[in-house]
Regions:
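Anion-binding alpha/beta catalytic cores of soluble intermediary-metabolism enzymes, centered on
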Residues: 1-174
């Protein structure tokens, strides 16, 4: 595998929602697609998502210390970089400020890693905007995580927010 290109960071989204499950399922069902990727999030959240899937095949979590380490791992494991304080177990399907904060912190970490050149790209799993706003400052300043990405990029480059273009792509099977 090429190691001259940084890996891709996936943020787990809202731990009370479908984001962690989507990511875990991708690693289980399409390991060839996730080969140069890692989760920038919480190990416990991802363990819980894997358990939810009740998959016939075991998928171990590899706790990594840096984004680059994801490129050195063998296939059939889920690399997770713990970028937030360990999360408590949160209830499924509930708007929770703690979940919003975790989701926002993961996106912020991944954004900064991309701006430093440590990751080639960011993929964000779904997060709940209401939970993000419930987390309070600074998360309630942004309508969603796209605006958070824009604000952090503007801050990093030293340009006014209005002059910072945002390029994003939505991807699905349809």
């Amino acid at each position: 595998m090429r190691t001259d290109t940084p890996p891709i960071a996936l943020t787990p989204g809202d731990p009370c929602g479908i984001g962690p499950e989507i990511i875990a399922r991708a690693w289980l069902e399409q390991p060839e697609v996730t080969r140069a990727c890692f989760v920038a999030g919480d190990v416990g959240v991802m363990r819980r998502a894997l358990a939810l899937l009740q998959a016939p095949v075991s998928l171990p979590i590899a706790v990594i210390d840096s984004p680059a380490e994801a490129l050195t791992l063998p296939p059939r494991c889920l690399p997770v970089l713990q970028v937030v304080d360990p999360a408590p177990e949160l209830p499924w399907g509930v708007v929770d400020a703690r979940a919003g904060r975790l989701a926002g912190e993961c996106v912020l970490w991944a954004t900064r890693a991309a701006l430093r050149g440590e990751v080639a790209a960011i993929v964000t799993a779904p997060l709940h905007k209401e939970a993000l706003h419930a987390a309070g400052s600074p998360w309630d300043r942004y309508p969603g995580h796209t605006e958070l990405l824009q604000a952090e990029s503007a801050r990093h480059t030293g340009v006014p927010l209005a002059q910072m273009p945002v390029r994003m792509m939505l991807a699905n099977d349809e």
